Amino acid sequence: MEIYFDNSSTTKISEDVTNEVVFGMKNFYGNPSSLHNLGLKSEKKLKECRETLAKTINAKENEIYFNSGGSEGNNFVLKGILKSGSHFITTPFEHASILNIIKKLEANNVKVTFLKIDKDGKVDLEHLRESITKDTALVSIMHVNNEIGVIQDLEVIGAIVREKSSRAKFHVDAVQGYGKFPIDVNKMNIDFLTVSAHKFHGPKGVGFVYIKKPNTIIPLIEGGSQESGVRAGTQNIPGIMGMTLAAKISNTNIQENYKKVFGIKERFIEKLKSIENIKINSPLSEKFSPYILNVSFKGIKGEVLLHFLEEAEIYVSTGSACSSKEREKLGGSYVLKALDLSKDEIQGGIRFSFSDDNNEEEVDYVIDNLNKGLKFLRRKR
């Protein structure tokens, strides 16, 4: 029995989306930059996809730009906006594609402010208000944290950025939130938004970035005039078609999927009450996404427990797949460290992440194997 509880790393592409990608490969192989009929046919399909995606976030079609996914999108925004002498505001537990750029930014004379967070990982809004200055060029906040699932209040944060500065831009890494929670870029005062298709049952290697004013940013990839000169390179039409269908399905079913996944997390937490020496780092509350459950199993290294579960065909993670090597160097998750957890709690952290493909019955199988694993590993220790 295979149980896949690692949906924050990536999701299984749906059958309908797979068929759409194949259809795109067979029928839209013309280069959309070509002037002949096959090229024009592909160009028209790209326009349709832009229009569909724009509607999901209340944007305009000409504000959607295709790329390879979240990491490229985050690099594009930071490197395209932040110049020498400017000021950047973010949090201490953003995705690696944000945090790993910071040393280079600081070497280029960019001042960086890390916002204070509370015990749950929510941004200290007063600190944000105090931190915005006349030099602030960009505020970058992750919508839903990829390790513990804490949800930031984008509407409030966007309002503060607008109130305090007419110059500062607001960037949202929506990789873990898009398709799971409603997003309105106008209501939330968002200037840049990054999205990755493989987090909502779409294909890997494709995503999009919303840009309110494209003339305010320097391209990351230069070359041809694709994507209105914002991002060079021939567009991945089959991937974009698959992403668009996956986005349409996910956004149409936001409430239904939320309710289903909430039930899975609720059952999981209830069953965990029978297990001793644990700490739930992402409880069942409005502050946290039901799609992510992070638990510290004290006295056990998370990686060891992960491999024990793997033997039973249960697939989980110890945190972000994009930061696994950095986590080894640090001796645990930098996200859990930012929450001031003990060394034992950090090293014993496991992330269970769900999707609408999962069901409550799978929880019982996982709990049974967790009990077996913990008894064996703790006794062995």
Question: For the regions a protein language model found, what residue spans apply to each?
Answer:
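Pyridoxal 5′-phosphate
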Residues: 1-381
